[in-house]
């Protein structure tokens, strides 16, 4: 068992307006994001399942052909290999979890 102080993790801006702190467990990748209004993540897919949980603010998340406004209390679940897109409707914070662990450029 281990504990991680996410406040001490390096902040990485992988895409404009998305400031993330990243860490892994043996089977998952976690991203704690602070996002800026208007920031987008282009439509894409990947082999990992992805879960979006908004902590503050709101996001417009498109999963496949369904678009929803996601705020505190609503979780977006992206199945593996499914096209999805995210637009920040306000400034805010979100936790994103990928399983299995996700490998991408720029992640510590």
Label each PLM-derived region with a short phrase.
Residues 1-27, 31, 77, 107-108:
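A short, N-terminal "cap"/entry segment at the start of jelly-roll beta-barrel domains
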Residues 16, 30-46:
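Conserved short histidine dyad/triad with adjacent acidic residue
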Residues 26, 62-66:
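Short strand-coil-strand connectors
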Residues 34-36, 46-61:
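Short, conserved beta-strand element in jelly-roll/cupin
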Residues 55-56, 71, 90:
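A cytosolic small-molecule/anion-sensing beta-strand core signal
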Residues 65-80:
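Short acidic-glycine-tyrosine-enriched beta hairpin
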Residues 80-104:
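Ligand-binding loop in jelly-roll beta-barrel domains
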């Amino acid at each position: 068992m281990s504990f991680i102080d996410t406040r001490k993790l390096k902040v990485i801006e992988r895409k404009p307006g998305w400031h993330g702190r990243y860490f892994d467990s043996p089977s998952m990748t976690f991203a704690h994001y602070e996002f800026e209004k208007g920031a987008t993540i282009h439509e894409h897919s990947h082999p990992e399942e992805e879960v979006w949980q908004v902590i503050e603010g709101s996001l417009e998340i498109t999963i496949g052909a369904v678009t929803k406004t996601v705020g505190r209390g609503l979780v977006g679940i992206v199945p593996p290999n499914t096209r999805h897109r995210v637009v920040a409707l306000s400034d805010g914070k979100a936790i994103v979890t990928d399983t299995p662990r996700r490998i991408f450029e720029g992640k510590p």
